[in-house]
Amino acid sequence: MRFLLTSLTAAMTLGLATPAQAWGPIGHRVTGAIADRNLSGVARANVRLLLGEDDLAEAATWPDDMKSDPADFWQKTASPWHYVTVKEGDVYKGSDAPPQGDAMTALTRFTATLRDPKAPVEDRRLALRFIVHIIGDLHQPLHAGGGDDRGGNNVRVTWFGRATNLHSVWDSAMIEQRSLSYSELADWLSRSITPEQTILWSQSDPQVWLRESIALRKTIYPADPALSWDYAYQHRTQVDGRLQRAGIRIAAYLNWLFEPAATTPAKAR
């Protein structure tokens, strides 16, 4: 890991970034659990080699867990790798990313590391954990923020009477409100994914995921800041769909990464 941390730090200017939590622990674990069920045999074997007894549900939360580490790498360098900023009406371009990078540039960098058979095992393990996490992040609409309200962090709302912000509602409040464990929610969401949806969702790429999140972003800002059952009901299908797609796409992406003969994620199954 020391090699990767050093090279990444040298390649990216250190800088404080907008705080972001992405999906909360339950949401991220759900995406990892769904992904686990859709790995190819080759990908599953490689994941086991890198993670040992850990599974993708645990790997999915690891980059957020490490935010408590006081090291500059976690507090500054890695902080902006959980989101992107795309202003309304614009399209994402990597050249517009800040000097320290963003979720899309980090995904590209970690993809190259994981595909490099000569990279140290610790570097590839770090890359795998970040890839699983970042793909989940890119499916949270407020992690494709427009740059004017810190991805909904500045939008003050109440959730069943409790003061919070819109970002937190989407990260965790709507998921936790259902009172299901991550494994129960992953089971329930997995049962409703059809074979046709699995194929369709596996054919996309990070730019597609990002465009989907940006399109949803426009629909989730409430006219009334007092949020409760109506808001939860209105957006439950969107939340479920993003978690499902993220899980399928994590698996498809890893299947592709670990099977170099496949030209696209959809063919690596």
Q: Model features per residue range: what roles?
A:
Residues A17-P19:
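N-terminal signal peptide c-region/cleavage motif recognized by signal peptidases
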Residues M1-L5:
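Positively charged n-region of N-terminal signal peptides that target proteins for export
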Residues Q21-I134, P141-R269:
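N-terminal, motif-rich segments that launch catalysis or mediate targeting to/interaction with membranes
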Residues T6-G15:
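Bacterial N-terminal signal peptides
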